[in-house]
């Protein structure tokens, strides 16, 4: 090396790249020490999780929690800026199931169980339960999210009934040290337009966040069959949130308003007003959240949380209208103590859920009012540097369905610095409801209300065990996670025939179960990252001594994602997902299929442009199967198990000020 001054770039897997200046030759041939900071690989273990109620990093939580944050959250937001379907669907063990061929409505399935068994939270508030869960994942935009936390398996001990399959906690951005102003504009080849903006700033004793968006789509029929694959819709969202910071007390107050008009069905009806089948959804959603935390001592905190939700939805088809208003509330007091080795939380909460049908209907009114009163205690105990134990117990009393006792336990063992294993399990329950995927498909027509005298809570027991290994193989970062899971659901609610051509829900006398495994492999080399995931889901009903596949659950699923990233300059991503055949509700089987995608983003200091080629192989159910029987004006829709929108290109610009 010729004498002179050189700039040397030092890098190592798992550590941040660093540039240093050296002089050659070194006069005393001494070694130059370089202090490097932990990079992204380690930062993942340092993410603080809130869904477990006891705020610890992922590395110190016995409960298995998956977190979608940072670059991954941003990349998924580029692909689908208008909602969180893709964000969730591309994780192992999670499938977003389309429940309506024309309205595009979808629910979340975790490990094969229907969407009603998954609890969706916003910053720990249960804002999307019952009737308000309809269209929920289609109306949540990802731009103002900091991270998404997913717990798979029984989690009712944490937040009450409904979390039999698991829970999804959507964690919002909060004001940081630096002001954040961002805007996004996105257009799609399917006639979609997404416009959104986010503002965040912290002042001395106060902070503010503000999110606003407009999302719309023209009716889209790529199969040219005369029915919408993507409906015509227009949605507006506004979400202000105020934060107050005192010496010992902090508070935040927020509100959200979402209004949407959505019309799917006959293209001739939507465009020209001609006769034909249609499904209209008019929704207005108002939610408020209040949180107060007071520091009692150096280690103890008292918290109060309250939320209110008003959800008004009108569903109209040519022969029927379902018009209902749901009002629900959540109030909770908790005492938290963080110790040197053990963390405690003790709390009580009250949930109310009130539904009233509005207008005239030929069906009996499905009105109800449920009140749930809960007490819970939870402890996380670091027994040693290698063993952490988490235990919890909840008691819930539901006014119409009685008392539920919900124990839960999880343990984490650090076998070596690179090898960790977690094992856990618990009980769960779900209050009977008419708001299921099956009822959504028939727009709640000819459906009797829940008979509270003959119905009881659906009860579950489940557990999981995972092994996580991380190391460096030369210049290659390597991590492998393998999960085994099992859930048994006793007396599930099923839809059966009733007199007069009606249908009703009743508890089955038997059970259903789901078991399987998930494998996630991650490799990093330089600017490349490879993610490979495999899910085996063996979900079955066991009714009348007969074992059958649970409908609309892919037994085998493969996720492949290859990313190339030059930090703060360029991102490229290639994806391929495989779904094996699925049993349909009519007893037939759908065909297996692949979905592929490619995205690119070019970044500058204050803005970036992105483009995404989603499903560029144009996989569509209408290519290899039908989505309805009967006539175009009076269709009887079949299960939707594959994409119906086909190949869609979207692209846009993001501005950061």
Identify the meaning behind each predicted range:
Residues 217-236, 245-303, 308-328:
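Flexible loop and strand-edge segments within Gram-negative outer membrane beta-barrel domains
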Residues 107, 125-152, 451-452:
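Short acidic/polar hinge/loop motifs at secondary-structure boundaries
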Residues 155-157, 167, 172-201, 228-231:
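Short strand-turn segments of transmembrane beta-barrel domains in outer membranes
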Residues 382-384, 479-489, 507-584, 654-656:
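Gram-negative outer-membrane beta-barrel transporters
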Residues 9-16, 25-75, 115, 295:
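Short, acidic, small-residue-rich periplasmic hinge/interaction motif at the N-terminus
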Residues 488-490, 495, 600-657:
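C-terminal beta-signal and adjacent terminal beta-strands/loops
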Residues 270-272, 276-295, 418-420, 424-488, ...:
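Outer-membrane beta-barrel signature, preferentially recognizing the C-terminal barrel domain
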